[in-house]
């Protein structure tokens, strides 16, 4: 804007200068022509007539007009000088404004460069983010494929012979645990029943002991066998099926002990069919081990319970004291 303004001012000054110069030149030319005509008139010697008198009057008027013309030239020069001074005073102001606008333009250019750099960085970040998103999508698809075609790490029921072998091994592992638990329960019952029913004889022979214990042992064997069959009837597997069928299914079997298995939803039907096809085998009759009654078992047990209760009370008291100290 200010460059255009300066150009316009310069053009106006040139026009004024040229117009004033043209006026001065025209006035000078007129004066020169008049002087030349007067000089030609003065060189000749014509006869004096009325026309000559008129010419003399005109020359006198020309002489009188010369100072007026010069005065006009001076005034025009003064005006031109004042206008030129005004233009000269205006030029530094315009220059200052142009400098200010140039500085502002430089600041704007720097800001534009900064914005361009930011845009470049943002575009680079966006491109890197797009690449990361693509890589993540690929990984997600790979994980989905792996989940769809994955193998079971906890327990894998395979098709064919290997699956059958693994299930048989699991069944064999479950059976000894159930037998151990039933044996432990029978031992506890025998130890609790013997001191009540079997009388303590002072130093009796082995033959008499066998005769006295044999009917009791038979009854205990029958009872244990019945209890074991009842426990097998009562112990039913708890099947927890999650709502999402793509997830694993937790099976807990309570046969004397908790056995948990994780199966896929696709293999659940095969596992249930295998369980239904297997015959229900009752555990073998446990071997009863005779234990002699000790008269010191009762007081020893009572003393141990008393000591444990005292220890628990002391421990609880110490814990409560620690909590109070920490609060304080």
From Swiss-Prot:
Residues 93-151 form a coiled coil. The modification Phosphothreonine is found at residue 182. Keywords: Coiled coil, Phosphoprotein. PANTHER family: COILED-COIL DOMAIN-CONTAINING PROTEIN 54. InterPro entries: Ccdc54. Signal peptide: none annotated. It comes from the Eukaryota. The keyword Phosphoprotein applies. This is Coiled-coil domain-containing protein 54.
């Amino acid at each position: 804007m200010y460059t255009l303004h300066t150009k316009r001012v310069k053009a106006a000054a040139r026009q004024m200068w040229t117009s004033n110069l043209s006026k001065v030149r025209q006035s000078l030319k007129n004066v020169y022509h008049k002087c030349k005509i007067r000089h030609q008139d003065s060189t000749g010697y014509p006869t004096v007539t009325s026309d000559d008198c008129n010419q003399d009057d005109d020359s006198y008027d020309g002489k009188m007009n010369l100072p007026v013309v010069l005065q006009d030239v001076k005034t025009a020069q003064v005006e031109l000088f004042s206008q030129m001074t005004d233009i000269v005073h205006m030029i530094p102001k315009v220059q200052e404004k142009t400098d200010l606008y140039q500085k502002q333009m430089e600041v704007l250019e720097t800001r534009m460069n900064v914005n361009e750099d930011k845009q470049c960085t943002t575009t680079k970040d966006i491109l890197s983010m797009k690449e990361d998103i693509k890589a993540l999508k690929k990984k997600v698809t790979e994980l989905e494929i792996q989940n769809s075609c994955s193998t079971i790490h906890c327990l894998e029921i395979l098709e064919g012979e290997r699956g059958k072998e693994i299930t048989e091994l699991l069944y064999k592992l479950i059976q000894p645990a159930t037998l151990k638990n039933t044996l432990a329960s029978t031992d506890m019952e025998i130890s609790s029943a013997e001191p009540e029913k079997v009388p303590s004889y002072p130093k009796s022979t082995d033959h008499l002991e066998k005769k006295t214990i044999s009917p009791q042992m038979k009854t205990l064997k029958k009872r244990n066998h019945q209890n074991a069959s009842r426990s097998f009837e009562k112990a039913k597997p708890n099947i927890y099926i999650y709502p999402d069928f793509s997830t694993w299914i937790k099976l807990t079997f309570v046969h004397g002990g908790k056995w948990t298995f994780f199966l896929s939803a696709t293999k659940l039907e095969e596992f249930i069919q295998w369980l239904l096809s297997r015959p229900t085998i009752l555990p073998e009759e446990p071997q009863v081990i005779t234990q002699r009654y000790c008269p010191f078992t009762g007081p020893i047990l009572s003393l141990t319970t008393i000591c444990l209760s005292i220890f628990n009370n002391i421990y609880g008291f110490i814990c409560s004291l620690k909590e109070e100290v920490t609060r304080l």
